[in-house]
C-alpha cells in the first residue's frame, strides 16, 4: 500500500485507530475490516449500491408492498472490502422526536416513503434514495412557536371527551401520526459523552433513522449482517457501518437483528418481547402481576450503608440531647453552630444562626452533604452528637424504581400512586398489561421515566408499545400509568388550561415512627399548552418541568395566588381539605418506604434528618369530577432551594430550626 493511501489528507491510519479502536472493539467490528473502513470514511465512499439492491414487491392484489434489500453478488464476510457506510437521515433526542419530524414541512412525507407507508413509494425508480434532510434549531423553534400560537381547546370534563379532543383530520397531521407510529420500528440509538461546565461528564442518548438503504434492511433473529453506529471524530459526525457476519449468495435477502442490544443480551428469555416492534405477538393472556422484588433488587449496583448498632444509637440519643441543650438557651443560640458542608447553596442563606464551617465532619454539630453518606456506624462512634441530613437506605424514597417497588407493595397504593412497572425487571408483565388493556378498550397511556434524570430528559408520554419497548435500550426506566384527568389551571398569561404539579419541601426528623413536617409554602410548575389527550410527545402540553429554551414561557406564581385562582375556578374545591389530603399522601409514602427492614426500606437512625422535595399532582376521581385526590409523582433528595431562598429569606433558618434544633414554628411548617 502506498504511503499516500495510508495518510489521507493528513489523517493517518494510526490516528484513526487511536481515536476509534475503543468504539470498534466495543461494537465487535472485526479488525481485518478496520483499514477499509478508515479508507471509506476518509474518502466518504458510500458504495453499498454497487453490491446490494432495494427491492419492492407487491402482494397478489397489488395492495401491500414489501421493501427489502438483496445481494447483487456472492460475498464473503472475511473479505476486508465488505464493510459499508450508511448515512443517517435524521437524528433526535427521544423527547423531541415529534418536534424534529415537524421541523421541516417535507420531512413527514419523506419519512413516510422511507418507512414504506406512502402509497406512491413503489412508483419511484428502485435506485432512487430519499434525500437527507437537514433540520435546524431555528426551524424547530419557528414550528414550535406556530403550534403554541394556535387557540387552545375548551376544557373537557370526561376521559372520553378528552380522548377525542385531538384531531388528525388534517392530511398533514395524519401523515405525521403515521410516521410517529412507525418511527420506533426504524430508529436506532447511540450514546455520546460530553463535559459540563463544572467538569463533570454527561451522557446523552441520540436516536437516529438510517438512510433509505439502511432502513430497508429487515429484522431477523438469524441475520447475515451487523449494523453498528460509529462517531467519526474528524467530522464529529455519526455513521452506521455494516459488515457481513456470514457469507451471502447472490439474491440472498440482507437482514439484521434490530433487537440486538444490551437488554437482549442480559435477558435472552425476553427476546420475544423485545422483538415486538418487528414481530408482534399476543401476550395479553399472560400474567400482568410481577412477583415481589428480590433482596438483590434493592442492593444491586448500589453502595451499602453501614448502620449503627443499638448501643451506639442510645449513646447518640443522649449526646444529641446534651448538645442541643448547650446550643440553645432561652430559645437563642449562644455559640457557633459548627457545620460540615460539601454544598452551601442553602447554608449560605442562614441569617439568624451564628455558624462556622469546619473541615472535619468529626468536629461538626451538623453534617450537610449533597454527596451520599454511607458509614453511619463510624459516624455514631466518631461523632455521636452530630446530626446528618441523610437517612440510611433513603434511596428507597429518592430513587424512582425503589420508591415504585415500595409503593406497589402497599394495598392502598391506588389511592396515592399510579400503577408502575420497572421495565428492566418487569417488561413481560407490562407488555401483558398493555395488550390486555388494548383488547378491552381501556385507558392505555403511559409515562416512561428514567430512574435518575430530571427536567423531562428521556421521559415520554405515549400509547405506543413499540416506543416503550425501544426506550429500554437507553438505560433503566420505569413506566407509570399516565394521569388522564389532571386538575387543570387557567394560565393568566396565555389563557390555556394546563397541567401543573406541586413541589413541597418536607422535613423528616425520624423514621419508625415517622416524625415529619411540610413547609407551609409550596411551588407550582405549569405546563404551557392547553391540556388534551393526544399528541403525547408535545412536551409543552404533557410536561411541567423541563429545560426551557425560552424563559418567557415560565410562569412564576406564589402559592397564595395559586390557591386563590384555583378556588375561584373550582368553587366546590376547598384548599384546606386538599392540603390535608396532600399531607396524608406524603406521610403515607414515607411510612410505606420505611415499612420493611433495610435494604428493602429506609432505616431509622438517631442521628439522621432529611429534607426532600416531594412532587404531587392533583387528579379528578374517575367516579366524580368533584372529588380531587393527590397523587405522588416522586421524592427528590436535596432539592434545589434557590427559589425558596429568593422568595422567603428565612427559609434556610426554618430548615435548620426544624431539622436540627427542634424549634418547630407552626406558622412555617405543619406536622404531617
Swiss-Prot record:
Q: Which UniProt keywords apply?
A: ATP-binding, Nucleotide-binding
- What is any one GO biological process for this UniProt entry? protein modification process
Where is the TTL domain positioned along the sequence? 332-670
PROSITE patterns of this UniProt entry? TTL
GO cellular-component term (any): cytoplasm
Q: Which residues bind ATP?
A: 480-483, 499, 501
What is the superkingdom listed in this entry's lineage? Eukaryota
For the keyword Ligase, the answer is no
Molecular function in Gene Ontology = ATP binding
Which segments of the protein form a coiled coil according to its record? Answer: none
Q: Name one Pfam family in it.
A: TTL
Function per UniProt: Regulates microtubule dynamics in uterine muscle cells.
Identify its protein family. Answer: Belongs to the tubulin--tyrosine ligase family.
UniProt-recorded name of the protein: Tubulin--tyrosine ligase-like protein 12
Per the record, the gene is: ttll-12
Amino acid at each position: 500500500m502506498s504511503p499516500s493511501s495510508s495518510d489521507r489528507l493528513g489523517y493517518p491510519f494510526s490516528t484513526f485507530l487511536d481515536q476509534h479502536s475503543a468504539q470498534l472493539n466495543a461494537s465487535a467490528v472485526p479488525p481485518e475490516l478496520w483499514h477499509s473502513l478508515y479508507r471509506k470514511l476518509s474518502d466518504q465512499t458510500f458504495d453499498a449500491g454497487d453490491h446490494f439492491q432495494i427491492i419492492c414487491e407487491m402482494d397478489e392484489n397489488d395492495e401491500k408492498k414489501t421493501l427489502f434489500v438483496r445481494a447483487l453478488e456472492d460475498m464473503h464476510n472475511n473479505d476486508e472490502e465488505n464493510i459499508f457506510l450508511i448515512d443517517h437521515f435524521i437524528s433526535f433526542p427521544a423527547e423531541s422526536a415529534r418536534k424534529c419530524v415537524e421541523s421541516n414541512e417535507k420531512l413527514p412525507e419523506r419519512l413516510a416513503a422511507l418507512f414504506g407507508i406512502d402509497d406512491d413509494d413503489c412508483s419511484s425508480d428502485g435506485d432512487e434514495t430519499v434525500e437527507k434532510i437537514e433540520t435546524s434549531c431555528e426551524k424547530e423553534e419557528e414550528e414550535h412557536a406556530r403550534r403554541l400560537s394556535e387557540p387552545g381547546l375548551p376544557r373537557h370534563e370526561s376521559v372520553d371527551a378528552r380522548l377525542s379532543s385531538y384531531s388528525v383530520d388534517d392530511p398533514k397531521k395524519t401523515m405525521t401520526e403515521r410516521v410517529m407510529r412507525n418511527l420506533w420500528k426504524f430508529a436506532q440509538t447511540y450514546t455520546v459523552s460530553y463535559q459540563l461546565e463544572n467538569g463533570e461528564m454527561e451522557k446523552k442518548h441520540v436516536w437516529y433513522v438510517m438512510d433509505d438503504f439502511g432502513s430497508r434492511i429487515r429484522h431477523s433473529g438469524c441475520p447475515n449482517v451487523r449494523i453498528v453506529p460509529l462517531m467519526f471524530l474528524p467530522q464529529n459526525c455519526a455513521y452506521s457501518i455494516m459488515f457481513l457476519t456470514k457469507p451471502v449468495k447472490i439474491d440472498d435477502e440482507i437482514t439484521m437483528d434490530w433487537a440486538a442490544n444490551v437488554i437482549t443480551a442480559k435477558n435472552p428469555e425476553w427476546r420475544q418481547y423485545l422483538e415486538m416492534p418487528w414481530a408482534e405477538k399476543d401476550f395479553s393472556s399472560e400474567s400482568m402481576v410481577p412477583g415481589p422484588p428480590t433482596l438483590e433488587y434493592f442492593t444491586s449496583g448500589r453502595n451499602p450503608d453501614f448502620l449503627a448498632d443499638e448501643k451506639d444509637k442510645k449513646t447518640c440519643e443522649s449526646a444529641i440531647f446534651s448538645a442541643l441543650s448547650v446550643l440553645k438557651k432561652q430559645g437563642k443560640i449562644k455559640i457557633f453552630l459548627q457545620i460540615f458542608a460539601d454544598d452551601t447553596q442553602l447554608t449560605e442563606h442562614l441569617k439568624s444562626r451564628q455558624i462556622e464551617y469546619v473541615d472535619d465532619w468529626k468536629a461538626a454539630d451538623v453534617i450537610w452533604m449533597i454527596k451520599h453518606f454511607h458509614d453511619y456506624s463510624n459516624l455514631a462512634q466518631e461523632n455521636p452528637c452530630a446530626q446528618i441530613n441523610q437517612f440510611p437506605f433513603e434511596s428507597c424514597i429518592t430513587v424512582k424504581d425503589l420508591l415504585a417497588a415500595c409503593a406497589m407493595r402497599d394495598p392502598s397504593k391506588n389511592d396515592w400512586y399510579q400503577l408502575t412497572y420497572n421495565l428492566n425487571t418487569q417488561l413481560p408483565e407490562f407488555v401483558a398489561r398493555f395488550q390486555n388493556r388494548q383488547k378491552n378498550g381501556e385507558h392505555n397511556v403511559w409515562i416512561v421515566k428514567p430512574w435518575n434524570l430530571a427536567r423531562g430528559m428521556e421521559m415520554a408520554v405515549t400509547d405506543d408499545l413499540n416506543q416503550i419497548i425501544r426506550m429500554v435500550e437507553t438505560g433503566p426506566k420505569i413506566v407509570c400509568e399516565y394521569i388522564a384527568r389532571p386538575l387543570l389551571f387557567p394560565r393568566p398569561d396565555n389563557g390555556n388550561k394546563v397541567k401543573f404539579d406541586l413541589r413541597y419541601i418536607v422535613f423528616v426528623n425520624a423514621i419508625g415512627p415517622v416524625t415529619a413536617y411540610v413547609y407551609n409554602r409550596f411551588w407550582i410548575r405549569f405546563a404551557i399548552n392547553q391540556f388534551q389527550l393526544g399528541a403525547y410527545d408535545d412536551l409543552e402540553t404533557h410536561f411541567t418541568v423541563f429545560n426551557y429554551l425560552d424563559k418567557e414561557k415560565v410562569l412564576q406564581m406564589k402559592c397564595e395566588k395559586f390557591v386563590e385562582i384555583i378556588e375561584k375556578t373550582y368553587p366546590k374545591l376547598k384548599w384546606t381539605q386538599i392540603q390535608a389530603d396532600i399531607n396524608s399522601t406524603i406521610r403515607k409514602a414515607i411510612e410505606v418506604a420505611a415499612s420493611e427492614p433495610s435494604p428493602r426500606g429506609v432505616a431509622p437512625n438517631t442521628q439522621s434528618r432529611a429534607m426532600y422535595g416531594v412532587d404531587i399532582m392533583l387528579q379528578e376521581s374517575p367516579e366524580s369530577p368533584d372529588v380531587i385526590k393527590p397523587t405522588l409523582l416522586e421524592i427528590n433528595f436535596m432539592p434545589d432551594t434557590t427559589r425558596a431562598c429568593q422568595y422567603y429569606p428565612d427559609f434556610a433558618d426554618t430548615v435548620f430550626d426544624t431539622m436540627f434544633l427542634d424549634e418547630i414554628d407552626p406558622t412555617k411548617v405543619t406536622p404531617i
